[in-house]
């Protein structure tokens, strides 16, 4: 089982994008590669630390911090999932990864799907964990997500007869 000394952690420059943090196993360079993509508000280390050693017994493992997260590319504007996917592709190319399996957890799932959609030449498969097809609800759904907490709190203080009338 790999130890901490069998991992490398470094920042790499992504041409035209900025610098990002990468952690990779030093195992067999010929082993299949897993590219781990983390969830919203987390980092690669936070989401994947407990799996590094087990996965690296059979795979080469690469983990990054996404655009605007942890030590990832510094975002001057709100990050978009497509930026995260393109950053991952740029990392793969900088590391000379021919083909890899993208493993996406939570927000990493749509990133993996965008990565495959935009860079099929380097993604040979996907593993999607606790995720969705997209994370940006449209129109009324977006409004309902924003208003829902307010309505929930109003329901706690509104008189019962008002709640019953509204429910009809």
Task: Tell me the role of every PLM-derived stretch.
Residues 153, 159-168:
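Helix-loop "lid/cap" segments that line or gate small-molecule binding pockets
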Residues 15-71:
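Conserved HGGG/HGGXW glycine-rich cap/lid loop of the alpha/beta-hydrolase fold
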Residues 104, 108, 112:
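Gly/Ala-rich beta-loop-alpha elbow adjacent to hydrolase catalytic centers
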Residues 1-19:
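N-terminal cap/lid segment of alpha/beta-hydrolase-fold proteins
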Residues 65, 101, 124-127:
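Residue in the alpha/beta-hydrolase core beta-strand immediately N-terminal to the catalytic nucleophile
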Residues 113-118, 122-155:
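Flexible "cap/lid" loop of the alpha/beta hydrolase fold
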Residues 46-48, 72-78, 137-139:
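Conserved catalytic-core motifs of eukaryotic protein kinase domains, centered on the activation segment
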Residues 82-99:
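Conserved acidic catalytic loop of the alpha/beta-hydrolase fold
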